[in-house]
Amino acid sequence: MTARSCGFKSHPEHQSFMNLLIATGNRHKFTEISAILAVPQLSFMSLKQLSGAPEVVEDGDTFEANAKKKAVTLARFSGMWTLADDSGLEVEALHGAPGVYSARYAGEPADDGANNRKVIAAMEGITDRTARFRCVIALSDPSGVVRTVSGACEGRLLSAIRGAGGFGYDPLFVPDGYNQTFAEISEETKNKISHRARALKLAIEAWSDCFIHARPAWPD
């Protein structure tokens, strides 16, 4: 198989790589992504390590648009293969909100506690607690050729936060098949079932040739 099979150009510079820029300044997200990928031969760089990186305004109306914009902009700037994600919480009773506005649902600056409180208030008295986390992963080569995959984790919302782990809306979200929130389950379990884990697993499978013919040891 050649790099063409993973949807990228077949020129040598567009084939496999050993260094990957993860386009996030969020330390929780960087740690989670690098732990989930867990490819021994692959080294990761965070956005905070990239001097002079431009700020990418996430003004798209879909997760895919935002992920692609981040990946392409920073790949072209850095000259590195770049992986970006955009993700958020979609609540059925709120017609998909907070959606792409998940990080800043309660306004700027982004604040997890304020966002959770706003969701709790919006859901007061509503019996349908169905929700999902959705994640779109974008991988761009240095020239800006980009591909995307997506993953989701279905679940339900609690009426109050529970648990001290995780970040974002994790203390409110109970994934299907579990009685604990994302903030209560182990990191190992979350990195197996989360929306981001599912999207990253699809990324590895779809672009295995790009990821230097290496696959992470995914949990059974």
Which residues does each PLM region occupy?
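Anionic-ligand binding patches
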Residues: 19-21, 27-220
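Short hydrophobic targeting helices and cationic amphipathic motifs
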Residues: 12-15
